[in-house]
Amino acid sequence: MAPAATAAASSGKGSFDLATLFVADKAARDEAGLALADAVKKSGVEFFTQIGFNDAIVKALNDKKSQSAREGACEVISTLCENGAAQLLEPHVISSAENTPFPALLEAFADKVAAVKTAAIAAVKAIVQSMNPWASFVLLPALLNLIRTSGKWQIKAGSLEILQQLITSAPYQMGEAMPDLVPVLAGAVWDTKSDVKKAAKATLEKAVSLVENKDIEKFVPALVKSLLNPIEEVPKTISLLSATTFVSEVTAPTISLIAPLLIRGLDERPTATKRKVCVIADNMSKLVDSEYTVRPFLPQLLPRLIKTAETIADPEARSVANRAIVTLRRIGKVPVESDGSDLPPLPVAEGPHLATNFVALVKKHGGVSVEQTNPGLAYAGVLAASLVNHHNFDQKTWESTLPPYLKLALPSYDSLPAVRELLQKKADEAETDDAKFPDEEEGEDLCNIEQFNLAYGAKILLHHANMRLKRGHRYGLCGRNGSGKSTLMNAIINNQVEGFPPPTEVRTFYVQHDIDGSEAEISILDWVLSDKRLLATPEEIKSTLESVGFDEVKQKNSIGSLSGGWKMKLALARAILFKADILLLDEPTNHLDVLNVDWLINYLTSLTRCTSIIVSHDSDFLNRTVTDVLHLNNFKLKRYPGNLEEFVKHVPEAKSYYQLDVAEDYQFKLPNPPLLDGVKTKEKSLLKMRNVSFQYPGSSIQQLYDISLQVSLSSRVAVLGPNGSGKSTLVKLLTGETEPNLGGQVWKHPNLVIGYVAQHAFHHIDNHLDSTPLEYMLWRYQTGEDLEEMHKANRVMTEAELAKMKEGATVIKDGVKRIIDELVARKKLKQSYEYEVSFKGMSSAENIWISRDELVARGFEKKVMELDTREAQRLGLMRPLVRREIEKHFEDFGLDAEFVSHNSMRGLSGGQKVKVVLGAATWRRPHIICLDEPTNYLDRESLAALIAALKNFEGGVLIITHNREFSESICTEVWAMREGHLEASGHNWVEGQGSGERIDKKAGDDDEVEYDALGNPIVKAKKEKKLSAADKRKAKKDRMARRKRGEEVFSDEEL
């Protein structure tokens, strides 16, 4: 037993009788502990070192013969923490020094004397409750190691109790440590000792309460079950989780619960389970904000994903796995050649090194010289290392955490300047890829938002993004299709961006794609005057309209009579009158000809007080207009100064915004057309227009004058001309959208299929926005015909045509008067066709065949065209309308199966909608593809892919576009429209078949694939070639010669 002695403290000499802390009398021990607390508060942090406190505590804890020594050592720790000396004690107890008492305190959890064990747990709890939360990372490794490896169940149970206290005292820090916590706790739940098992379960339940992700809160109990009972629960939990849409940030607590499930799920046998795991991994990884969050799980998760992608049989599931791999590689910054298991260790900040930095910085900022070994300074270095290693560079956190401990070493020194400089240095080292530009602080701020989020429905678009806009700047908003460019613009105008200035402070105007079709009858002037938001007088409005090309006559015209280009100019005129601070322009060059694009560039660059945000896929326009680029990528918004060329220097991988290069992994594929009856070369005309004139009903001006032209499989036509010159009208006549009304004739091959995408491409899907692309396709082609064809002018009967058909429906056969009911079937008749006709009130046995010319003469031309279309479908043009085939078709246009089958079209971006329209138009394997302004909503990557696909297409191509780069890269023939007149150049119009290569029989070509009723390909037996008499004689002669040589040879007859 230690000798009794009176407590004596001398702050001047730095002495204290430590033996008094370990005496048998508890009251005396308590009095000595209080005296020590008073002494150290007066003398400072180095007092513990001067009196040899740590050595004495460790010696007492290891004194197996003295219960009072062991109990007293634990009690004095609690007394110091409870009496205001905790901050002075921390640097000595929580450090990496060899003589720290903390390991000995943990070993005391297994003391045979219950009082000592209780005192030890109370002491550690007191330390944990009073210490700085960032010290948790110093204590945690020792606790987890004991839970995992200790042979004494009391130590395990006690450590688990301390962990529970840590979760209460330092929730954020323990959340960050969850990747280390969860595996240890999941293992401890299966301990053989029931006390440990019970404590581990309670600790795990408390730990998972740190998960604050709203997406998975309701699944936490299921996730815990899958950790504890993986064989039974993993498949169930994966099914539950696969239906979840992740929109909240995925942090360390969330991923530490989900990652073990994914790792185990990839070891399951069913392909469906593996696919679900890949979907979860992909969706979850997109919302991980830092590589450090996902790094602990990469060595196990990524190799399994790679193995799944290489071994799984289902190609669609393989593509999902590959997508997840790409996302994980990007988030974790894993090189292509690595599978994540051989990554170099992350840099680790060391406490002593940062303490050395503090010594230098204190001296630099006018402080007195201080030893690096000073406990307060050394401990500040340890805490700074914890902050750096967990990537916390928040100024408030650093300023509240470190100065109190630096003050222990330098009581009269203001350490804030030194702390801030070290913070800046470490933050710069950690964020080398997030360069700031020197002009960041120049100019007047219109908007400066930090840390905002943006989602569209269930899809996250921006996460913790920043946006700073300067007055007079022109920002080009760049990003891939579907990255959220138009959604961000809509969110700004609808006041849905948190922190964006309200309309009362900053006037913002959105120049939209198109003008509402419901206002088609309103005159242009009245439409502009009716807008109450415009700060302009009627005179100003008229003069502004004149300045953009609307003279007095045009101002009185209805909006419905305007072409796409003029509608866009009208929307821009309204934007000018709005006098906005911020102008949002979404594809402003759509439908504009070259002269109007130049006018727009001059107008935008002349604005000095107005800021513009521009979304455009016209790289030349952006290059000549913008002063900065806002890059929307990986859920962030990053500003780069300069135009598009300068931006590409900073971000080389964004070259696709500037150059029309086809990416190897991103290509479109157009289905090649089948053969047509009577068409033996690509030069033979399939579509003709002869002396056609046209004028819209109600219009005072004729649109087309005496147009003659023809189109064949070899045609590559660019239809050019200024806005309003009749380009779209010409194409509508060719495709049957409208019909000639001032004379002339349009002829097309009976079996010809045309794939048409209109100028306002979205009108094809406007009434189906709440359907998925799959549902839209199933609706459009449900009868085997294209239901959009049914609404074309050349399929709708006029009153005059109905009267003519009624008059011509009477047929006299064998003296009996019959009335034609329907056209039933068709067959070849010389150079034309004849049609089987049924009669009203008569059986099918009475049907007769009538030639095409006679039926046309009787007024049945549109009925003939209807049957021709049906027959064209039947003759092999039709494809099985099943989900797998539709998904594969859209995949050829860069649209994933996820969007085709599971996303409504309302939620798709403009570029994705264009891909749906293109895919739907080409489903029937058209012979001629007709595209009216196809480049409007496609990004550069998709545009390059479309150009390559059109070049390889075996059919004819007609393109209306103002994009010269696009037309020149494809087209060899030009139809120039000028005020309704056509000037054709570069064409090769022939009568008959022409002299080109024959396409009706190509050497080595197999017959076209035919399908049965279930959509399965029919494998035809190969025809055997019959031998001629000469061949038979030659074979016989050969057999005789071989027999003569002694070989055994038999013919089929002999066998």
UniProtKB/Swiss-Prot annotation:
Q: Where is the signal peptide?
A: none
Biological or metabolic pathway of the protein: Protein biosynthesis; polypeptide chain elongation
Q: Offer one Pfam family short name for this entry.
A: ABC_tran
> Which of UniProt's keywords are assigned here?
ATP-binding, Cytoplasm, Elongation factor, Hydrolase, Nucleotide-binding, Protein biosynthesis, Repeat, RNA-binding
Tell me where the HEAT repeats sit in this chain: 45-86, 96-133, 135-172, 175-213, 217-255, 257-290, 295-337
What EC number(s) does this enzyme carry?
Answer: 3.6.4.-
Residues binding ADP: V45, N723, E933, N936, H962
Kindly state which reaction or reactions the protein catalyses: ATP + H2O = ADP + phosphate + H(+)
Q: Which GO terms describe its cellular component?
A: cytosol
Q: Does the keyword Kinase apply?
A: no
Cite the SUPFAM superfamilies for this sequence: ARM repeat, P-loop containing nucleoside triphosphate hydrolases
Q: Which InterPro entries match?
A: AAA+_ATPase (IPR003593), ABC_transporter-like_ATP-bd (IPR003439), ABC_transporter-like_CS (IPR017871), ABCF_EF3_subfamily (IPR050611), ARM-like (IPR011989), ARM-type_fold (IPR016024), Chromo/chromo_shadow_dom (IPR000953), eEF3_ABC2_chromodomain-like (IPR015688)
| Entry similarity comment | Belongs to the ABC transporter superfamily. ABCF family. EF3 subfamily.
| Function field | Ribosome-dependent ATPase that functions in cytoplasmic translation elongation. Required for the ATP-dependent release of deacylated tRNA from the ribosomal E-site during protein biosynthesis. Stimulates the eEF1A-dependent binding of aminoacyl-tRNA to the ribosomal A-site, which has reduced affinity for tRNA as long as the E-site is occupied. Assists translation termination by stimulating the release of nascent protein from the ribosome by release factors. Appears to target calcium-channel protein CCH1 to the plasma membrane.
Q: What is this protein called?
A: Elongation factor 3
Q: Which gene encodes it?
A: TEF3
